[in-house]
Amino acid sequence: MLDAKYLRENLEEVEARLATRGSEVSLGRFRELDERRRALLTESESLKALKNSVSEAISKVKDKSQIQDKIAEMREVGVRIKGLDDELRGIEDELQMVLLTVPNVPHPTVPVGASEADNRQVRTWGEPPCFAFDPKPHWEIGEGLGILDFERGAKLTGARFTLYRGAGARLERALVNFMLDLHTERHNYLEMLPPFVVNRESMTGTGQLPKFEDDLFHLEGVDYFLIPTAEVPVTNIHRAEILKAADLPLSYTAYTPCFRKEAGSYGKDVRGLIRQHQFNKVELVKFVHPATSYDELEKLLSNAEEVLRQLGLAYRVVELCTGDMGFSAAKTYDIEVWLPGQETYREISSCSNFEDFQSRRASIRFREDEKSKPEFVHTLNGSGLAVGRTLVAILENYQQEDGSVVIPDVLRPYMGGLQKIG
């Protein structure tokens, strides 16, 4: 959520920067409500000052019969004050709802563009493998090895659900454990295991609500939601808290399943694991001092990249343009892994700096010292990594002509020493 004072003082600049996102964001309603709010506040405070002053004078008059008119007038003033305060509460509630639907302002360094075609490639790592045969897509490999069962997954639930079997299930579990070990032991993140169901306040705090409620799985009969990402519960761990500057940065990692309706994705990635309603992910979340948040973003990005480097998977890093960024982000990098079966790079992680956009919504603050005024922290997060897509990349990059798949060296201890599937 943007700061109302900053918005008021920089309205035209903010509108211009939000326009680069490609969404039609009009701040006219904010201006109307904000002006009405300030007018009501001024009138209410003026009447309260008058009422207090007159009431004090009345209290000093011994013969109240001489000032009955003034007493009656102050009763009317009290009624007027109540009416103003009631209207003010309604205006403030509506103003809050308007602010909750305004996206974050892109950082000045973010490239301006309309779509992913305008994203900027930052770097590449590794060389895509060369095969002496035509590489298969992961769904053919997985079905051929009997480790992915798309038909039974659909029977159990529906489209975009998959049953992992045998070595496929073990490989998924191995990836989760490998990622968590890497981030906790080498990168010094604290592991969390949060609830997979959260309340409305948590979804609002990270920016999923109120704007994207139709994209979420809502539980019937209770106002809870299945999480679309561990970002939601982990960021909200410190909702409505004041942290100590000396404790920053706080770095957390968590494995969770994620649940998404994937509204608007009809016809996209209809085969395989790329776009599922339920998938596993290891998330990285940071609470940082505003002065160091962009340095911390680069560190978080490097931590996510390290997973792919350890696995020997070629990838590239792209900086998202203004029109391709998520609602809450001020700056985002995507990591895209090479998939030979599709002959293209596909997103496997998004790493973002939200600045104080989420912390303002969730009231996550810090103090420099005991006497300092609380300030909003900056929040960052990124996938470290999407587990299913990492499994996809392993199947496609490590496939052999005979249909088998070689297990990357770093995963073999997690696979009981298994060197190859098939």
Curated annotation (Swiss-Prot):
Q: What is its main location?
A: cytoplasm
**The organism sits in which domain of life?**
Bacteria
Pathway in which this enzyme or protein is active:
Aminoacyl-tRNA biosynthesis; selenocysteinyl-tRNA(Sec) biosynthesis; L-seryl-tRNA(Sec) from L-serine and tRNA(Sec): step 1/1
Q: Which GO terms describe its molecular function?
A: ATP binding; serine-tRNA ligase activity
Which GO biological process categories is it annotated with? selenocysteine biosynthetic process; seryl-tRNA aminoacylation
The record lists L-serine as bound by 229-231, 283, 383
Please state where this protein is localized: Cytoplasm
- GO cellular component terms given for this protein: cytoplasm
> Where along the chain is ATP bound?
260-262, 347-350
Q: Which keywords label this protein?
A: Aminoacyl-tRNA synthetase, ATP-binding, Cytoplasm, Ligase, Nucleotide-binding, Protein biosynthesis
Enzymatic reactions: tRNA(Ser) + L-serine + ATP = L-seryl-tRNA(Ser) + AMP + diphosphate + H(+); tRNA(Sec) + L-serine + ATP = L-seryl-tRNA(Sec) + AMP + diphosphate + H(+)
Which Enzyme Commission number(s) are listed?
Answer: 6.1.1.11
The record comments on the domains as follows: Consists of two distinct domains, a catalytic core and a N-terminal extension that is involved in tRNA binding.
Query: Which NCBIfam families does the UniProt entry name for this protein?
Result: serS (TIGR00414)
Q: Which family does it belong to?
A: Belongs to the class-II aminoacyl-tRNA synthetase family. Type-1 seryl-tRNA synthetase subfamily.
Job of this protein:
Catalyzes the attachment of serine to tRNA(Ser). Is also able to aminoacylate tRNA(Sec) with serine, to form the misacylated tRNA L-seryl-tRNA(Sec), which will be further converted into selenocysteinyl-tRNA(Sec).
Q: How does it assemble?
A: Homodimer. The tRNA molecule binds across the dimer.
What is the recorded name of this protein? Answer: Serine--tRNA ligase
Say which species the protein is native to.
Geobacter sulfurreducens (strain ATCC 51573 / DSM 12127 / PCA)
